[in-house]
Amino acid sequence: MSSYSAQLREEQQAVSRAYDRLDALRAQARSRLDTVRAAGSHGSPTQRTERDSFATMYEDRLTQLRAVEDRLVFGRLDDVHGAHRYIGRIGLSDEDHEPILTDWRADAARPFYEATPSNHGDIVMRRHITLSFREVVGVEDEVLDVHSDQVGEASSNGTLTGEGALLASLNAKRTGKMTDIVATIQGEQDRIIRADLNQAVVVQGGPGTGKTAVALHRAAYLLYTHRRALQRSGVLVVGPSSTFLHYIDQVLPSLGETGVVSRTIADLIPGIIATAHDDPYAAKLKGERRMAKAIANAVAARERVPSHLPVIRINGFNVPMVRADIEQAIADAKRTRQPHNKARETFVRDMLSAMRNRYVERLDYEPEQAELNDVMQQLRMNDDLRKTLNLAWLPMTGEWLVDQLFAKPQQLRRFAPWLEERDIETLMRPKGSPFTVSDVPLLDEAMELLGPDPKAVARQKALDAKRAEEEQFAKDTLAQAGIGSGIVTSQMLVDNINGMDAELTAQRAAADREWTYGHIVVDEAQELTAMDWRMLIRRCPSRSFTIVGDVAQTSALGGTRSWRRMMDPLFGERNWQLNELTINYRNPKEVSQLASDFASSEGLYLSLIHISEPTRPLYI
């Protein structure tokens, strides 16, 4: 048996041990879950609540353990003392709590990504392990300490490489699931992945520099490192297409994370289906930042004094609607700084009070409260008054407002006066036309200014009341059991009752337009317009972003060709950082050099890419 085969056999033993432990933990979690479920619904409320809590915990554990089946182990670190540390997708220990596998996101795994021959600490060798299902099919070593005895061993074993493991992994046959991204990270990517949560990190890189790997790894790493902060808010990943999002859905679970919402710009608003596309010039016009002003103008125009004011008949008295009353009610409603539909409640309330006071002025006696209540009821039921109040402060939906804006040229002229006639002709379309992808940020802008549908507000209030009732019930049961100050809190029990794990958090976030995320990852970000960015920042007020793209590849007319020109107005000059990936592992040196020469001659943006040494071509 060759030395290389012996290395494979040695690693197979370690990998098999890790999988055996994984199987044992799965069986243990399954057994405990079955025991809890077998208890049924018997017992006191406290006992049932605790069973629900434990059942959810075991279900979550099973989901986590199942998600890391593929390529459980992918690396090993050897230190100066001769100890081995295996790196994988999850942390595992044996029954005596001795470590078997180190989670790739733990600090102990950092050298696997960051160590270099010039800065390796106590690590002397890094080994990359390749699996096919549960079988070890390849190992490659990087000796980080040239004075180590392991240099000769790795050379004689046929496992020694320089950057060969990374190059081999990146040049290997690529699959739709991109499932080998963990083992391809190198130092410059790792620093980006582990950057602080509360900032905007822009990753600029040309083709083949691993931008997408950085984006997905950063999402998984942040979910792991900041899981308390992100468990209830979640992470949003915005990609260029549904195909890309399918990749994400396949890759992130294999990293041990599932609580991520993945969307394109087109399907970011729940209930809105936008499949049509504008021509490039129309899309550019709709993507300009000043279109937010057009939407604001369209909303403000629906807060006005109608030209005709009726006289309302109440209990035999003619009570006229007075212009000054409407103007005052509009001013008071605007001062609330509430969205249009919410502020309308203040406007209507003030107008009803004003009309009641006008009625009282016509009386020669002091009315009883019962009469005043009756007058208010009559006012609420009066058709003429209701129509006039609607004309003065029209309740609207975002869909209706945007549809009207592009169906009537006079509205575009009025609300977007900077548009030229040819621009207006480009944007016009028949009323009721399907919404386009470029409409989605405008719809979101309108919905933000208008506020939620009153019916949706009522539903949310009912849900909040139900949750408060459940939490009170949990507190009462804990108090009765005498464990109110123990390790299980009422909040934990309510969360488990409602299944508020990461996956359900993602489901709730995806269904709520007003949900604010703890972090947003954007791939192919150079294609986004200013209005796209407004929509995304609205969903992450903390401005915690990972932004990935290549401004040299921008194809959209409304996209960005300068990160600074786009990012400074959004985040502020000092609140975002630009990181450039400089290693190209995909393209041969000759191809990349030719592309660089052409870009320079044409005055195009040029990434500072260090091109790796050529490797043996892989034919697929």
Regions picked out by a protein language model, each given a short descriptive name:
Residues 186, 190-197, 220, 390, ...:
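Amphipathic, well-packed alpha-helical segments that form the structural scaffold of globular domains
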Residues 1-5, 9-25, 29, 40, ...:
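P-loop NTPase Walker
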Residues 1-182, 186-191:
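Extended, charged low-complexity regulatory segments
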Residues 196-199, 205, 232-234, 246-415:
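Conserved ATP-dependent motor core of P-loop NTPases, especially the RecA-like helicase ATPase domain
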Residues 324-519, 528-533:
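Conserved helicase NTPase catalytic core signature
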Residues 228, 233, 242-286, 447-454, ...:
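Conserved helicase motor core of SF1/SF2 NTP-dependent helicases
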